[in-house]
Amino acid sequence: IKLYEKLTQMKVPPRQPYVGELVYAAFSGSHQDAIAKGMAYRANGNDKYWNVPYLAIDPQDVGKEYMADVIRINSQSGKGGVSYLLESAFGYEIPIGMREELGYTVKGFSDNLHKELQNDEVLAIFRNEYINLDNPIKLNEYSFNRDNNYYSVLLEVQNGDTTVKLKGSGNGMLDSVSNAIKNCLGYHYILTDYKEHAKEVGSNSLAISYVSITINGKKIWGVGEDEDIASSSIKALLSAINRSNKEASV
């Protein structure tokens, strides 16, 4: 296309069939959700032939890329488009229950900036709004003791300018940490969802944890990222709690 435009001094219309810049682009939330589901279905080996909603042919057959030319993120985008981008381009496996909240968060940034967001901008929003948030509560150190399936924890956190030592117990590591935070720092919430997976980063593997808490009927998500799965899950819980503090202050 660039060669054609250079040699002819003619511009290829953005909606020109097969080759236009926007021919395969999906901005609409409902279109993105349908395409994301179709691509996921195809990735699982369920389709012998190309059969993805709103895409008559495979864009890669004509030199297009899914991330750059199909899923485009702006204020109209849906939960499926944002999650598909983070999963396909950056290796995150966004829980189904988190996708709507995340989609609205990213759309809000696009709306405020009045522009389409690039992949690295979406990642930056995800990291800044959800991952390893440490204000006002930051994890310093912890240790667990286990008796069968019952855990007790000694936890040190930074709560604003104060270093606080917490103690708690529960039916799992995360449950014991949650109880320590609620009992010692006075938070009131229900621990509602937890998911984890590994993400390859070069030759290393990171543990990614997703935690949701419910406060007054509203679910709030946080994400933790660490080489250690226990640290990752604790950071995810603290991210959710810190996000609840941020929302309460708005």
Predicted regions and their residues:
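Small-residue-enriched alpha-helical segments and adjacent helix-cap loops
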Residues: 152, 160-185, 189-198
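A mid-to-C-terminal "edge-of-domain" accessory segment
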Residues: 1-167, 203-206
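Mixed-charge, glycine-accented linear interaction segment located at domain edges/termini
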Residues: 219-221, 225-250
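Glycine-rich phosphate/pyrophosphate-binding loops
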Residues: 89, 93, 97, 186-194, ...
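Positively charged, aromatic-enriched nucleic acid-contacting surfaces
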Residues: 153-157, 199-222
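Short alpha-helix boundary/capping segments
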Residues: 74, 165-172, 221-232
